[in-house]
Amino acid sequence: MGQLRKIFGKIKVTLPIPHLLELQVDSFKKFLQEGVAPASRADVGLEGVFRSVFPIEDFNKTASLEYVSYDIGEPKYDMDECISKGLTYEAPIRIKVRLVVFDVDEETESRTIRDIKEQDIYFGTVPLMSEQGTFIINGTERVIVNQLQRSPGIIFEHDSGKTHTSRKVLYSCRIIPMRGSWLDFDFDHKDILYVRIDRRRKMPATVLLKAMGLSKQDILDYYYDVEEYQIDRHIVRRKVVENQYRKENAWVDLCLEDGKVIVARDKQITKFGWKKLVRGGVEYIEVDPKSLVGQFAFNDITDPDTGEVIAEAADEITEEIFERIQEVGLKDVKVLHTQGADVSSALRDSMMLDKTTDVESAQIEIYRRLRPSSPPTAEIAANFFENLFRSSDYYDLSSVGRYKLNARLNIETPLELRTLTNEDILTAVKVLCKLKDSHGPADDIDNLGNRRVRPVGELVENQYRIGLVRMERAIKERMSLQEVATLMPHDLINPKPVAAVLKEFFGTSQLSQFMDQTNPLSEVTHKRRLSALGPGGLTRERAGFEVRDVHVSHYGRICPIETPEGPNIGLIVSLTTYSKVNDFGFIESPYRTIKDSTMTDEILYYDATREVGHVVAQANAPIDEKGSFTNPLVTCRLNGDVSMHPREDATLMDISPSQTVSVSAALIPFLEHDDANRALMGSNMQRQAVPLLKTSQPLVGTGMEANVAQDSGSCVLAENDGVIDYVDAERLVVRYDDGVYPDTGGVKHYELQKWHKSNQNSCYGQRPRLPIGTPVKKGDVLADGPGIKDGELALGKNLLVAFMPWCGYNFEDSILISERVVKEDVFTSVHIEEFELVARDTKLGPEEVTRDIPNVSEEMLRNLDECGIIRLGARIAPDDILVGKITPKGETQLTPEEKLLRAIFGDKARDVKNTSLKVPPGIEGTVVDVKVFNRRSGEKDDRTRNIEDFELAKHDMKESKHIESLTNKTRVKIADVVANKQIAQTLMGRKKGEVLAEAGHIITDEILAEVPLKKLGGLFADKETNEAVKQLLAEYDKQIRIIKGIYDVKREKVTEGDDLPPGVIKMVKVYIAVKRKLSVGDKMAGRHGNKGVVSNILPEQDMPFFDNGTPMDIVLNPLGVPSRMNIGQIMETHLGWAALALGQKFAAMLDTGEALGVIRQEIKDTFESEDVYELIDSLDDEEFRLAVNKAREGIVTKTPVFDGATEEEIWDLVGKTGIGDDGKVTLYDGRTGDPFHNRVTVGVMYILKLHHLVDEKIHARSTGPYSLVTQQPLGGKAQFGGQRLGEMEVWALEAYGAAYLLQEFLTVKSDDVTGRVKMYEKIVKGDNFLEAGLPESFNVLVKELMSLGLDVNLLQDEVEETADKK
């Protein structure tokens, strides 16, 4: 049905928003690969884990356990059963393994296969994800939050001069694997390069390079260029090489061959002059003979005659060595190029500190540092070093780590090679040395290119791997202890370690969270959340400001607004609307590509690293029809900096202005006019909005509402095109076109949720939207969920608001509200409370659920049935009995007289005590559901049988509706086949002698409807037609058998009994619907962070009112706006008022009988936009009437974030309403009727009721439980506690000298046990004076002193004596 709506967005968005739960659902699908054939499964997820741990070989290599494939079975219970019975929704896994036994030849050590055994083994269960992205663990819905973690790979950073007192900037580099040892290289203040493995003691970096197999000379060759010198007696010349420029003065005039002087003597050689020399072909220049002194030999310098080593490679050339070189007459000397402008001798200096000489000594040195306790041999050390970085069993960079390493070091190692190579380490050290010598910037660890998301699939995969590794150890031990030849694979494999790890992860991990299920939005945002906390992540205490802060790379990937306000600020964030996570775990944002400064339709996703270097234009840059920029200069982003660029430079363009914010921030209209702090509160508070009894769409929305509602899984969506065949409050039957549900003929039966208790106790119910016979298209909303109206999110209500002070009732953000809101149930919400009673087998006998409870009046039992369980629909109040239960008491020894009396009168009341389930304080409501769970073998009571009969009748009805819909569909198919076909014989009707059609007649649709389907086979003259009809009927029979089979299984489940925990005989769950009306103390909020508490509910007649008598619904304090800077609420107020007034204006025109054509034209003139013209022209008269009638409550407007209605547009619409042009009116005081002095801003604002409800927080105690040790009353609502009178309150009473009051507070009202009893006796007798005793906490103090060895005695007698003397 058409709805009048005005969309203010001007930017056309070509890309639809990806499904909001895509990350969760796809990640788990990839992990499980459930529908994929074992042979074609990719080496990821579960398959990858099995392949990485298997094959498992024993220590002697005589047997090998190999993995073949796995298979996932069907879950035993469906999701609803798991929730109601408190079970985990999981499926069994079976793995196929092969045990290969070898014969080993002792001499040659070659192996021959002796035996192969293959077997299918049950391998425990794995929790399954629901379509909504949740897991059901022990009956509660949980969400695994995606973790945001430092990416494996390599990172170069510096300490900003904070480490050393000299303030010198020290550079370091770290190689982080997915699993294995961390490798750190860092410089100290003396420019020595050290290496640390696993953050142990540091050693010179060259130790590691030597351990890798490099000699001293190899290292120098790799890291340093060679400077060549020619020595001719006292003249020293240096070879001119282009990249060996250094700052120095010319020793002589430097000339070209033609004699032209390039650099005069004693003048500095510039870079330009050096290039001229190179280009002029100058080979050598004469330098200061002393310039060789202080340089380092490139290789060993030897005496050409004797072979004596004058200086070893890397040695410093001193004056003595220089003189020796001249003596022996060496002509050519090679030194390290370390004195250039951008090179240094750091690595050579590190080498000089290195005491190791070869590979062996270096490997032993590393072994000593990492395993200080055990003495090494060369073989052990070599083995240890090999396993450190080069063995895939111990070290795994992961494909992400390899990808990052390749990208940063600019190398091309294949992604499959996931261990460290020599090239990786050598290049890393080279890049680090260049970085230190100021080549390029260090990396930014907070950039999203260096942080990756670990989604559900990966987190579960890691847990599975941990479990399998534990199991692997056990298997190896078993293989070595027993004779493998006699064993079968199932003797070796015990899946318990894996099950234990999974159970622990899903049940207790920091990332496995109880789903926030207050409303559909809170579900969606919880599943899109990213957390930097959790195992392997940060901790709240250690996380600094930089990690929490917004980073330029967050643009379009992580929302800068939505994050918690407390200690977790910035550590828990949300994905933006359009972002995706790629296979490597990096967050990507979509951009449109620009070619030759013209927009193309190509859309590409870029992660933070790939985006570097691109000039990105904003989504709101003006564009002509051809897709070219209209302005010569465009606002663009380049590497995070915003500036103006020529339009030719732009290479990418944002998709949509809302791509920078998350889902809940994108639901705030005029977000661009709100201060960020308030927008944060606004987006967080929408998640706390309680779904209301009656829902209504916001008059001012953003266009995101439909996406959230439909992707949340709370609505029922059409899975294909089709027709609604049946609908009532509890079920929907849809007859789809062919393509879905082929087994049941394309007919789908939807069970609607009713009275479903969410995790936060809100009532989740679904309401059908469309009547029977409505054709539906794929993706249409068939039924609305909680807080959803017409397939769009509707969490609050549109209220008439006035911004004015009113007698101090809106002081400090308080809210004054009209009684109409309470009377008409505008903000009434329903909450479901669940109570559970368990009857167990005790040592003294079984507990019994019964109505026969000792010492309880008939009045208390009035709502219980004969089994002792409360009836459906009963109104209950605190302390009412919900389920009667008696527990056997310990038998006491009876006297013979008592035994006789008991035998005569049958008084068993003393044997049992009343342990019934009662309603706790503060809960009043109606019983909406009762579930009774019995042991499979146990006896069923009447109530259980009634419930079973009711459930069976429901299944019967469902089955009949399902079959009826299938029959209709088959009839339609047959009608198409037999159209215009003659029948071969006369067709008789249902009544006696009634003839429907004579032989030879053509059958009509009316006749066809009268004939049972079974009779249509072989009815026609045409053989082909008969064949086609028979085929359709055969298909119909098969489908009916399948449908009956489905419902038979369901019926069996109803009657089969339940698996209860050991010792439990019966379990009863009672569900109570509590209606919470709006009351003083409830917290309410708008969408702009404007929150407050209801301070007073005023009668309608006392509220401020318009001159036409309409009273306000809500009065807010105008002082709450300027300092908070959330101007969005004012713009929403004005636009909402215009939307309401215009809707009422059009409806009034309809009521006064105005011609429809005139109303159509009026609407077009008012809105002046193409989409409104199209909508008005597409509606026929009846649809148009309905649309205008619906607009009586206001015309829905959509103002997308950063692309919404401008101020001019709002004032334009307000002007067209005819009620003033500045949004202010004169209001009248409801109490006196006088006008207020000033005109008041009024309008319509969307207000939410948050789940901080006063009814759930308020509580009162007269007497109640006491603490065991101190005997003082407990604290808190959950314990039914009292209020604590602390030391400060005591000081206040002391200051006023209120001695008697103080005595009462500190004794009888607190912890004077005997005093309490005496007090009661005195009150009963009517004596009104206080006799206080000793507080119990004083005794506790005395006992504590005794524990310290101090004996404390109270001197009562002496005190009395002294009093007597006085």
Swiss-Prot record:
Name the GO terms of the biological process aspect: DNA-templated transcription
Q: Can you tell me where the transmembrane regions are?
A: none
Q: Name one GO cellular component term.
A: DNA-directed RNA polymerase complex
Task: List the catalytic activities from the record.
Answer: RNA(n) + a ribonucleoside 5'-triphosphate = RNA(n+1) + diphosphate
What are the alphabetically sorted keywords of the record?
Answer: DNA-directed RNA polymerase, Nucleotidyltransferase, Transcription, Transferase
A GO molecular-function descriptor: DNA binding
The similarity annotation says: Belongs to the RNA polymerase beta chain family.
Q: How does it assemble?
A: The RNAP catalytic core consists of 2 alpha, 1 beta, 1 beta' and 1 omega subunit. When a sigma factor is associated with the core the holoenzyme is formed, which can initiate transcription.
Q: What NCBIfam families has UniProt attached to this entry? A: PRK00405.1, rpoB
Write the protein's name.
Answer: DNA-directed RNA polymerase subunit beta
Name the gene: rpoB
